[in-house]
Amino acid sequence: MTTTLTRPADGEGSVQVQQDASVRIQEGALVIAVYGKGGIGKSTTSSNLSAAFSKLGKRVLQIGCDPKHDSTFTLTHRMVPTVIDILEEVDFHSEELRPDDFMFEGFNGVKCVESGGPPAGTGCGGYVTGQTVKLLKEHHLLEDTDVVIFDVLGDVVCGGFAAPLQHANYCLIVTANDFDSIFAMNRIVAAINAKAKNYKVRLGGVIANRSAELDQIEKFNQQTGLKTMAHFKNVDAIRRSRLKKCTIFEMDSSDEGVMECQNEYLSLAQKMLDNVEPLEAEPLKDREIFDLLGFD
């Protein structure tokens, strides 16, 4: 059961969505939450990273945490029903469901779940995420999983959409080499630090996406203590893979940039499996970001 509690350790006067402590992802699984500015390419990044983990022989589960429910369509090649939609069909009697009602197999055996969300302007996305994890646990679907990836809505860092951080070992932040993306990343760093006071989640690093250069990202990293873990340039093959509803690993490896992207995703996956050193980063004040990046 999800309740709302005041947690001063998360920030003075903060109110956070607190999940049932008994609903936990099994110990031993690598759990990653992927955040970043809206439209930055988190779903593409998450799906390709899931595919990379599967290529390394891992059993992977990707959970989409966005009401748009488009996180996993490049893995499944279609838009799958959401957990919240399926639960509504059975009047929220989860015992009536079978695993294949809400979990779908995607590329190379990756398991895919879309949590969905409440109607616009109502409810809490964090509650839906909590119900999704609870449902997976009830059906013993987390017991044979090596890697779990939460693909989280935009850069919303309220108590609800910060809920995946309560399950994660690491948070990866997707950004571009521009002011708006970095500004959003700074807010996400603050949210992760707040959650880290009460949960095991730690910063894993930065994924630079659709960026030819890294100068602004690296300038920010140096000031905050972040580190770039992977760099994906503005490769047209990634755009085309979305149009074809497939991962970069299903594209022709002879096409320009495809092999380079595949290797970068495999390298990132291996770094995470090797227990990357958590980062101790400190966010900047808004004014400091403007001074650092805004007036060159």
Curated annotation (Swiss-Prot):
Protein name: Light-independent protochlorophyllide reductase iron-sulfur ATP-binding protein
This protein's pathway: Porphyrin-containing compound metabolism; chlorophyll biosynthesis (light-independent)
Cofactor: [4Fe-4S] cluster
UniProt-annotated binding residues for ATP: G39, I40, G41, K42, S43, T44, K68, N209, R210
Entry keyword set: 4Fe-4S, ATP-binding, Chlorophyll biosynthesis, Iron, Iron-sulfur, Magnesium, Metal-binding, Nucleotide-binding, Oxidoreductase, Photosynthesis
Subunit structure: Homodimer. Protochlorophyllide reductase is composed of three subunits; ChlL, ChlN and ChlB.
Top-rank taxon: Bacteria
Pfam families, per database record: Fer4_NifH
E.C. code: 1.3.7.7
Catalytic activity: chlorophyllide a + oxidized 2[4Fe-4S]-[ferredoxin] + 2 ADP + 2 phosphate = protochlorophyllide a + reduced 2[4Fe-4S]-[ferredoxin] + 2 ATP + 2 H2O
Sample GO molecular function, one term: ATP binding
Residues binding [4Fe-4S] cluster, per UniProt: C124, C158
Similarity section: Belongs to the NifH/BchL/ChlL family.
Gene3D superfamilies tied to this protein: P-loop containing nucleotide triphosphate hydrolases
